[in-house]
């Protein structure tokens, strides 16, 4: 007998607050968590650890298919556990990002990782954070949410985050970067950023995180 495992997808542009929302939903629902944005970095790191050539589809595909990774919500952070080891800080390194770009360019690797992401949908349920979770990866998900916010608000949030780290940045530069990324994401040929037809669209521009979580939970309860 197969146990039904509900899937909640949360898509949206960079800086809308998807990560925080997904982490809180996973904690409140007791569900598993998938941070799809980190999955290519995780694979790149696994390849480096195992000495697999970053340009070798032959070596990367089996690694992707059997990727031993968990995403665990702890406090206000998501810990990434690769083969039993916390690699959260390693994932943020620039060289990991560059390696991820190389593996993401390989079609067979992308297909293998797509199947691996779908395997996260296991009991008791899954909250999946990304840009195409509801439109490509989990098209049959019971609950689909698209979290948005104005580019100005997202730039403002990012600026506050950087200032808290002691970094001074110009608002207009941040805004320009976000607008350029939005344009790329929404107009790309493969899996453009858009809400699924049956998604709840939440605009968090003038909402705090508690309000966003409350609306999301109400929607989830109405669907499950």
Swiss-Prot record:
One GO term in the molecular function aspect is:
ATP binding
The positions annotated for binding ATP are: 12-20
What this protein is called in its record is: Cytidylate kinase
Its GO biological process terms? nucleobase-containing small molecule interconversion; pyrimidine nucleotide metabolic process
Q: Which residues cross the membrane?
A: none
Q: Answer whether the UniProt record assigns the keyword Nucleotide-binding to this protein.
A: yes
Q: Where in the cell is it found?
A: Cytoplasm
* Catalytic activity, reaction form: CMP + ATP = CDP + ADP; dCMP + ATP = dCDP + ADP
Q: Which family does it belong to?
A: Belongs to the cytidylate kinase family. Type 1 subfamily.
Kindly list the GO CC terms recorded for this protein: cytosol
Q: Superkingdom of this entry's organism?
A: Bacteria
Which keywords annotate this record?
ATP-binding, Cytoplasm, Kinase, Nucleotide-binding, Transferase
Q: Tell me its EC number(s), please.
A: 2.7.4.25
SUPFAM superfamilies according to UniProt: P-loop containing nucleoside triphosphate hydrolases
Database matches in InterPro entries:
Cytidylate_kin (IPR003136), Cytidylate_kinase_dom (IPR011994), P-loop_NTPase (IPR027417)
| Gene name for this UniProt entry | cmk
Pfam family of the protein (one): Cytidylate_kin
């Amino acid at each position: 007998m197969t146990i039904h495992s509900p899937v909640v997808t949360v898509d949206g542009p960079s800086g809308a607050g998807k990560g925080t929302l997904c982490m809180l939903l996973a904690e409140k629902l007791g569900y598993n968590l998938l941070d799809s944005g980190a999955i290519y970095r995780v694979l790149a790191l696994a390849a480096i650890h195992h000495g697999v050539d970053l340009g070798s589809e032959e070596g990367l595909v089996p690694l992707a298919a059997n990727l031993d990774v968990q995403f665990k919500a702890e406090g206000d952070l998501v810990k990434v556990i690769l083969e039993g080891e916390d690699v959260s800080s390693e994932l943020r390194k620039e060289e990991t990002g560059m390696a991820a770009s190389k593996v993401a360019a390989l079609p067979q690797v992308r297909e293998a990782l797509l199947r691996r992401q779908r395997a996260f949908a296991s009991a008791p349920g899954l909250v999946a954070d990304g840009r195409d979770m509801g439109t490509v990866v989990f098209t049959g998900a019971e609950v689909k949410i698209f979290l948005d916010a104005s580019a100005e608000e997202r730039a403002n949030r990012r600026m506050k985050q950087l200032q808290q780290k002691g970094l001074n940045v110009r608002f207009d530069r941040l805004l320009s970067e976000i607008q350029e990324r939005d344009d790329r994401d929404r107009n790309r040929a493969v899996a453009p950023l858009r809400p699924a037809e049956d998604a709840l669209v939440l605009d968090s521009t003038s909402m705090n995180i508690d309000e966003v979580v409350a609306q999301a939970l109400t929607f989830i309860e109405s669907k499950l």
